[in-house]
Every structure is written in structure tokens, then in C-alpha cells.
Amino acid sequence: MDRTLIQEILEVVEQAAIASAKLTGCGLKNEADAAAVEAMRDRMGKINMRGRIVIGEGERDEAPMLYIGEEVGSGTGPGVDFAVDPCEGTNLCANSQRGSMAVLAASETGGLFNAPDFYMKKLAAPPAAKGKVDINKSATENINILSECLGIAVSDLVIVVMDRARHKDLIAEIRATGARVQPISDGDVQAAIACGFAGTGTHCLMGIGAAPEGVISAAALRALGGHFQGQLVYDPAVAQTKEWEGLTREGNLARLAEMGISDPDKVYEANELASGENVVFAGSGITDGLLFGGVKFESDCVRTSSLVISTLDNSARFTDTVHIKPGAQSIALR
């Protein structure tokens, strides 16, 4: 994977973000997602690569495009595996709320964990706490470790948690330590990545979210040197989601076994979820967020704000791109 390919991967998320942003605030989350999917696949098709979707919009019979196993690209060139979420935070986009973005992770063939469409317990933390916090420790223990590693008082730590009923006890425990809780309604990828940067005001992500997004978060944090661990959740009593109504713990365990997962309780480290030699994360804002701005439509141009993180050169590049419309008369700087 070279720098030219990485630039094209950036353009993939930019085009997905622009397509989805045209429906920001319209209350049409499914349409916004579909627009992003189509734009992402179209741009991928123009890249000289043998691409494969390992995490996408669902199984082949569930999604018309970017389904798991779909081949993308020209069919020649380097082999690249992708984990994609063309519109992360569809509800956020539909309601013009902060934090929606187009994201993906990429690596050479075989470099990304093919996460099942399950839930995942996650722990993300800054590089200073890597290998010191642990997903098997209590929230209280991890918060005290974070405080010591970062040199920040417990009362000044901000812990991001998805605002879900299943996290009632977790939130209560965090607050009992004196740390602050920042609940989010959707989209935990950006919060996880924010843990990898100092000065974002986000010190840790805890709790249960979607497993596929966990792989994308792991790819970014691995490249940043941050901490990420994930553990699959298969018990409906733990997940506490309407999506799993009627499912059983035993049935989910059987599904995991069919997928080749022999140890359903395994704790995955970042370098297991994103194990490739060359791992790239790319994200482009649909709406304004913690790390970058959303798409801005001007009379003569469209502006995108994006982030690319790569293990190729251990870099994180924030990119502000002006997409000039044909016949443009003037281009706004800001």
C-alpha cells in the first residue's frame, strides 16, 4: 500500500461524506446511508486494486452494495481489505447533529479481523495508558490507572459512554469515582479515536457498541499508538437491544461457532483486530464533530474536512479539501 493508494482512499470517504451530507437534517437516515454507500463504491471502483469488503453493509443477500465479500476496484493491483461504514451515525446525519462521518479502515489482504455483526465491549484509551488499563478490570480500576498515567485528577477525566439502558450501572460506577461521563447517542468511532489525541477532552471510551465499528476504531488507535481492546458480546441480556429480541445466548454462540470463532470470550487487542503490516484509517466529516468539521456547501465549491491515519509512515493527517465546481468564479478560503 503506497501513498498514492492512500490518497485515493481519502477521496473515497470524501465522496461518501459529500453524498450523505446532501441529506443532512432531512430526517432520511436510510436514504443518507444509501447515498454514501453508492458514492463510496463508485469511487472504490476507479482505484487500481484488488479490493475486498470484509466488513460492510451486511451479508450478500442483505445489501446491494458494499456487502461482505464483495470485490471492489479495477481487479488489478495490490490486494486490499476494507472495513467500511459509509455513514457512521445515520441518525446524527438525519437530524443534523454532531458526529456523523464516512469512515473506513484498510489493510493488505488478511490484515483486518472479519468481525461478525454482533456487539462488542470496548475500551479505548490514550497511548500513555496502553497496556495498563484492561477491559477485564473494573471501570473504577481503569479510571484510577488513567488518572495516574495521564497525570490528570480523576475529577477531570471525561469518559465517553453510549447512552443506552445497558450502561446504567457502568455510568453510575464511573460517576461514583468522581470522573465525568459524556453520553453519546450514536457513533462511537470518533470518540474512540479522540482518545488517541491529547487535547480533545476525551480520555476514555467504555461500554458496548457495534463490533464492526470496533475494528475501524482499532485500526486508527493502533496507528496512533493508543489502547484498544474489544470483546464480543453474545448474551442478549447483556446487549439489551431490541434488535436481538427473540434471540438467545445459546443461539448466538452457535452463530459464532459457525463463523469459526472458537473462543467467544476472547479479548482482542488492537493489533489483532487490525493485524496488517500497513493499516490505514480514513474518515471524513458529514456533520461537524470532535475531530473535524462536516461538509460545507458553497456556491462555487464543496469543502470537506478529513483525517487519515497510517502505519505506513506513522502519521495522522488532517486534510481540508476544496472541491471546485465547474465554472467557479470565486473560492472561499473559510
From Swiss-Prot:
Reactions catalysed according to its record: beta-D-fructose 1,6-bisphosphate + H2O = beta-D-fructose 6-phosphate + phosphate; D-sedoheptulose 1,7-bisphosphate + H2O = D-sedoheptulose 7-phosphate + phosphate
Pathway: Carbohydrate biosynthesis; Calvin cycle
Positions that bind Mn(2+) 1: 33, 57
Cofactor(s) listed in the protein's UniProt record: Mn(2+)
EC number(s) recorded for this UniProt protein: 3.1.3.11, 3.1.3.37
Pfam hit, one: FBPase_glpX
Sorted UniProt keywords: Calvin cycle, Carbohydrate metabolism, Hydrolase, Manganese, Metal-binding
Protein residues bound to Mn(2+) 2: 85, 88, 213
Positions of substrate binding: 88-90, 119, 164-166, 186-188
InterPro entries linked: FBPase_class-2/SBPase (IPR004464)
GO cellular component, one term: cytosol
GO BP: any one term: gluconeogenesis
Job description of the protein: Catalyzes the hydrolysis of fructose 1,6-bisphosphate (Fru 1,6-P2) and sedoheptulose 1,7-bisphosphate (Sed 1,7-P2) to fructose 6-phosphate and sedoheptulose 7-phosphate, respectively.
Assembly and binders: Homotetramer.
This protein's name: D-fructose 1,6-bisphosphatase class 2/sedoheptulose 1,7-bisphosphatase
Gene source species: Synechococcus sp. (strain RCC307)
Lineage: Bacteria, Bacillati, Cyanobacteriota, Cyanophyceae, Synechococcales
